[in-house]
């Protein structure tokens, strides 16, 4: 990485760190007037602040850099092999199964050093992507992971006591999207995934295992892919052309997308030298031979030329979009109802007043709701009381009627008992009289018989 590019980035980062909250209002008329009032002066002698870029470069070299790559592609498409080849390092990534029930993201961080530059490299691999029968929501874990890294950085940024210089930035700087070399068109899963990622990360599409497709088919495939991306509104990363030193090569490389790549850590002897290549019965595919694949172009564009721009785009475009949406959800804005600049304190006081009014309104609603529910409950209880009273009166009336019936039956029964007793007494008297009469008659007959016998 050139010192001028590092200095340019660090100056930009220093400016962004102090004026992040007012980025959206810099185009206002007031800011324009302020810039017009700045005068340019010529110094009469040497001061020394010309060494500021060198100071920033030295400080940056001491702190080191971080770069985070997201590899999205089907299992076995060659993601790990390409990363190993790009950084000329064996990262010892283990093979993934084709039978994962859902998509998982696995992040591994490594510390690399080239000359005196230290790089903290994080590689995020999508495990199980495209292996499910239902692939409709396969992109969602990737989106959630990217948002989670943005949220972690935002929370660190919003802390009262923060340390962004020592904070391990895990935001994804580039997404290498591996496309299967079918030679036909993009899969629906690829279009859907890239469409949901293009506003959150810098996407660089690559055709994996390009040695399985002929050059003619590969060129047609590239044209077909770019046509589908444009027609579906997928925004992929474009190499910047605003820097005159790299504008020409970047413009040419933009026309070469997507890159058709081949990865390999195996060395094969070609001529008198050993090169990274793939050995086949029909010949050798050299990884770093531009006539065989676009690996060198990808490495030059990704690492040697535009790594810093990818980091800047992540911070100034994708993260700022996430940050703005989150702050707007919280009620923060740069301008008021009359399009006048609003400070954070004013926004805070306005939201505080709004929340206070909302709380009072909800408290009043809760009180009214409580009173209403109490009234409804009282009405229900009174209605239940009336029903119980009516039921009680009804039962009481039935009880009285039943009691009267029983009293009547008792009276009739007592009358029957008295009548029966009278009849019984009469019957007993009559029976005794009859018995006495019968006994008298028997004695008379006996006496008469005795007299006749004598």
From Swiss-Prot:
GO biological process: cytoskeleton-dependent cytokinesis; protein localization
Predominant subcellular localization, coarse grouping: cytoplasm
Residues that coordinate or bind GTP: 73-80, 128, 209-217, 263, 278
Keyword RNA-binding: no
Ranges for domain Septin-type G: 63-329
GO molecular function list: GTP binding; GTPase activity; molecular adaptor activity
Transmembrane segments: none
Location of the protein in the cell: Cytoplasm; Cytoplasm, Cytoskeleton; Cell projection, Cilium, Flagellum
Domain of life: Eukaryota
Region spans: G3 motif: 125-128
Any Gene Ontology CC annotation: motile cilium
Keyword set, alphabetical order: Cell cycle, Cell division, Cell projection, Cilium, Cytoplasm, Cytoskeleton, Flagellum, GTP-binding, Nucleotide-binding
Tissue expression remark: Widely expressed. Abundantly expressed in heart and kidney, placenta, skeletal muscles, liver and lung, as well as various tumor cell lines.
Modification after translation, per record: Proteolytically cleaved in vitro in a calmodulin-dependent manner.
Annotated region (G1 motif), positions in chain: 73-80
Any Pfam family matching the protein: Septin
G4 motif, as annotated region: 208-211
Functional description taken from the UniProt entry: Filament-forming cytoskeletal GTPase. May play a role in cytokinesis (Potential).
Assembly: Septins polymerize into heterooligomeric protein complexes that form filaments, and can associate with cellular membranes, actin filaments and microtubules. GTPase activity is required for filament formation. Interacts with ADGB.
Name of the protein in its database record: Septin-10
Lineage: Eukaryota, Metazoa, Chordata, Craniata, Vertebrata
């Amino acid at each position: 990485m050139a010192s001028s590019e590092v200095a340019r980035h660090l100056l930009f980062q220093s400016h962004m760190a102090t004026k992040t909250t007012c980025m959206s209002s810099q185009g206002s008329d007031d800011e324009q007037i302020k810039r017009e009032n700045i005068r340019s002066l010529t110094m009469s002698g040497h001061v020394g602040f010309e060494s500021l870029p060198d100071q920033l470069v030295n400080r940056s070299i001491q702190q080191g850099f971080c770069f985070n790559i997201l590899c999205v592609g089907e299992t076995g498409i060659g993601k790990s092999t390409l990363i190993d080849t790009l950084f000329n390092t064996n990262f010892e990534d283990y093979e993934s199964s084709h039978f994962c029930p859902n998509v998982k993201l696995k992040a591994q961080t490594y510390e690399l050093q080239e000359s005196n530059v230290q790089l903290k490299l994080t590689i995020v691999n999508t495990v199980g992507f495209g292996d499910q029968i239902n692939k409709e929501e396969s992109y969602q874990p990737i989106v959630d992971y990217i948002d989670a890294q943005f949220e972690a950085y935002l929370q660190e940024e919003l802390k009262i006591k923060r340390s962004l210089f020592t904070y391990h930035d895990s935001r994804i700087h580039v997404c290498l999207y591996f496309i299967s070399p079918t030679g036909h068109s993009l899969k629906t899963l690829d279009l859907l995934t890239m469409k949901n990622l293009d506003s959150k990360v810098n996407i660089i599409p690559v055709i994996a295992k390009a040695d399985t497709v002929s050059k003619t088919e590969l060129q047609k495939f590239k044209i077909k892919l770019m046509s589908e991306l444009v027609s579906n509104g997928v925004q992929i990363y474009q190499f910047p052309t605003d820097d005159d030193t790299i504008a020409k090569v970047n413009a040419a490389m933009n026309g070469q997308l997507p890159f058709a790549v081949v990865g390999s850590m195996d060395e094969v002897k070609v001529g008198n030298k050993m090169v990274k290549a793939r050995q086949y019965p029909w010949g050798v595919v050299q990884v770093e031979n531009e006539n065989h694949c676009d690996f060198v172009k990808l490495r030059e564009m990704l690492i040697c030329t535009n790594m810093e721009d990818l980091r800047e785009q992540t911070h100034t475009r994708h993260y700022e979009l996430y940050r703005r949406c989150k702050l707007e959800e919280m009620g923060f804005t740069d301008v008021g109802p009359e399009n006048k600049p609003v400070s954070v304190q004013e926004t805070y006081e306005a939201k505080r007043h709004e929340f206070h009014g909302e709380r009072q309104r909800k408290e009043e609603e809760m009180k009214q709701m409580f009173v209403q529910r109490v009234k409804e409950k009282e009405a229900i209880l009174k209605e239940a009381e009336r029903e119980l009273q009516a039921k009680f009166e009804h039962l009481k009336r039935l009880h009285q009627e039943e009691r009267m019936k029983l009293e009547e039956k008792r009276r009739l029964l007592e009358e029957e008992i008295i009548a029966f007793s009278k009849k019984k007494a009469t019957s007993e008297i009559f029976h005794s009289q009859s018995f006495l009469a019968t006994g008298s008659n028997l004695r008379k007959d006996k006496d008469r018989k005795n007299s006749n016998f004598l």
